């Protein structure tokens, strides 16, 4: 190992995750905190006949299950369960994982036909919070400044959106257009306003709150239409722009097809 090197800058940006070392070092305040709601276990399988991405939610059994193809032709399969079942999972990870997959018989059968290529991994340290994203000489972005349960998979989209706004604020501040502290304060306001509704919706969804009757009617309309059913779940989970699916013209089209 070489000798330690000290680098200095007028502004240090921390994009170092929910357990940000920079946030800890500067004592960044936390607000709108909600303790971890779900824990997740996952592993990787080979030889699974699967779509590129699959998503299943079982509200009554309190499970979210999703899988996706990786670059090594493996499939990552995740199971999310409430924190009050975390110890149950820890005692029998493989058994609870299989019991969860069995809630979707067809999917479970395809997984059994494959081969698990790695050990199981788990994560329960998934609190929901905002951090003040700036101070004298520092700023935070991504999960370091705003972290949510992975349920709606919003983190990467929010991070990519927010980094554009942070870059704009830094450019204005360091470029002399206005005081850096003012630009960064506006960034915090902008970030919070843009994320507030999704933050609350994600918390509600992760608690497996009952869905409204309208959703069940819509799900019935797409039951025999796999492509539309996939679009519905992706729109609800912000994997595509919700307005591309939940617009009057598209909803009228779907309900008309069931008559």
Predicted regions and their residues:
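FAD/FMN-dependent oxidoreductases across multiple families
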Residues: 87-181
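Short flexible/disordered coil segments
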Residues: 9, 46-50, 112-118, 123-124, ...
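Short secondary-structure transition/capping segments
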Residues: 23-24, 83-91, 153-156, 219-236
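Conserved short-loop catalytic and cofactor-binding motifs
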Residues: 29, 85, 151-154, 206
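C-terminal helical "tail/cap" subdomain of flavin- and related membrane-associated enzymes
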Residues: 168-259
């Amino acid at each position: 190992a070489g000798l330690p090197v000290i680098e200095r800058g007028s502004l240090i940006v921390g994009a170092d995750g929910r357990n940000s070392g920079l946030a800890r070092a500067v004592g960044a305040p936390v607000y709108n905190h909600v303790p971890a709601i779900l824990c997740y276990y996952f592993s990787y399988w080979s030889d699974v006949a699967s779509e590129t991405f699959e998503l299943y939610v079982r509200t009554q059994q309190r499970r979210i299950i999703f899988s996706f193809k990786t670059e090594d032709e493996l499939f990552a399969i995740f199971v999310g369960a409430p924190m009050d079942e975390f110890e149950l999972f820890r005692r029998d990870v493989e058994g609870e994982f299989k019991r969860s997959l069995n809630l979707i018989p067809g999917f479970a059968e395809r997984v059994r036909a494959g081969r698990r290529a790695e050990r199981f991994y788990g994560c329960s340290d998934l609190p929901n919070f905002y951090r003040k994203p700036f101070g004298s000489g520092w700023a935070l972005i991504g999960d370091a400044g705003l972290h949510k349960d992975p349920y709606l998979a919003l983190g990467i989209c929010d991070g990519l959106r927010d980094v554009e706004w942070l870059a704009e604020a830094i450019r204005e501040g360091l470029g002399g257009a206005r005081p850096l502290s003012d630009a960064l304060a506006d960034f915090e306001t902008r970030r919070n306003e843009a994320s507030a509704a999704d933050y609350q919706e994600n918390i509600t969804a992760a608690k497996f709150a009952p869905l409204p009757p309208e959703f069940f009617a819509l799900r019935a309309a797409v039951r025999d239409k796999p492509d539309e059913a996939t679009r519905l779940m992706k729109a609800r989970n912000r994997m595509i722009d919700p307005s591309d699916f939940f617009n009057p013209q598209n909803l009228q089209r779907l309900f008309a097809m069931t008559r």
